[in-house]
Amino acid sequence: MTAETNSLSGNPQRAINTNVNGQSNQGVNTRIDGTQDAYPWLPANVAYVPPADAIQEVNVVTNSFDAEQGLAGGAAVNVQIKSGTNQFHGTGVWFTTNQDLTARNYFQTDIKLFPTKNSNHQNQFGGTFGGPIVKNKLFFFVDYEGTLQRNLAGPDTRSLPTAAMLSGDFRNLPGNPIIYDPATGNATGQGKQQISCNGVLNMICPNRIDYASAQMSQLLAPSVAQEFTTANGLNNFSGSGTASFTRNNADIKINYLPNPRAMIFGHYSFSKSLVFDPPLLGNAGGDATNGGQLGDAPGMIQSVGLGGTYTFTPNLLLDWNFGFTRQNLSATFDLGSPDGLDLLKIPGTNGAGVPNGNDLYNGLPAFQVNSASSSVNFGNPNTGNPFQFRDNQYVTGANLSWNRGKHSLRGGIEWNHTQLNHFQPQGGTFQTARGSFLFNGNVTSLPGTTPTYFNSVADFLLGLPNQTGKAYQVFNPSLCDGHSGLGTFAISGR
């Protein structure tokens, strides 16, 4: 068994992975009241985790699987939600923890440097209630669990251009870096001269600053902190933000006994979640301070199950079920407008001409300002953002059991259907859906030398990237996968 996997936005249920019998963690098939509870895109996880107080029992089979327990190599797990009874029963729970109840971060034990622990408030609360609607006939059970988490994300230290640098002034910087003019010298870069503006060396004239870079500089302005000094070196900015995680899980189950021979049940489960991971540089984007997906990540998971039994004779029993599970998860950031096209005026980043173009291509491109000594990202650098998963699962089946003496015979049929409908253009570690631009300092340095961070910033201001790229989703992947089976087995007593 492993800890919670994947990001909060990709796994808001905080499902864990389990290896059984030495098999892959993808070999565990989990159901809730017979309804498939798989996560098609991340099959080591489950789609929905009901509140602990809502669970009546968990049946785990790890070997000698029955014919009806397919799609499992390690374990077949069936979780049963509680049912109402002839008596009203209810429970309530509240759990809380904060930074005062937890240990210090292993890397923040120096009280002089870190006088206080990062704020971390977690609250989980809920309850259950069940009872009769019509005694001996109709019963109900409901439960709810809310999770609220707010924590200080960061601090995260970066090197940011100063206000003077963003205006083109690269004088009086640590190490006295020289910014070379790419408009001078030959095609191989030999013969470059130090850049100047009106005779002032290491100055970029305002009319040479790229329009997109100037617009990004305005977004960066509120984040620019202190000047570079010998004491702090390149790390002149420390940012943090308040990350949040909100989740509401609930189940409703109805049981109906129309006559002594029959029983019918139905359940509806849902989980609505919202994850927020603040960008390091506010409106200018940057890396996520909590290490996940930038911005908001809403999610909605729903599960519906119907089932029942019918006793024809004391020896002959029919059981059946139907289930539907839907996942709708997404992670988005700055999608309100095509900023790359409208604000920065960079063609091809958003809008018309984008294959399968839609609002999910909106937002700021990624600007990576890198050097051997430091790096910083502007815009939206996350190569997996945005994403939208809309996955459906259907399952239906029926079994007929016959018993006589020490012998039993059971047969059945099941149909299982899975649909994937995803949007997530991915381009490795560089390309994003909105376009990516890398500035590594080579443009404003001499060939054969090691560019400094300040050369990289100068490249950015001049609008001369060393590398560009963009991730396109040429077609929207849509997968349908179905399984059906018919099985019988007999058991004879000794």
What do the PLM-derived regions correspond to, one by one?
Residues 1-494:
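Short acidic-glycine motifs
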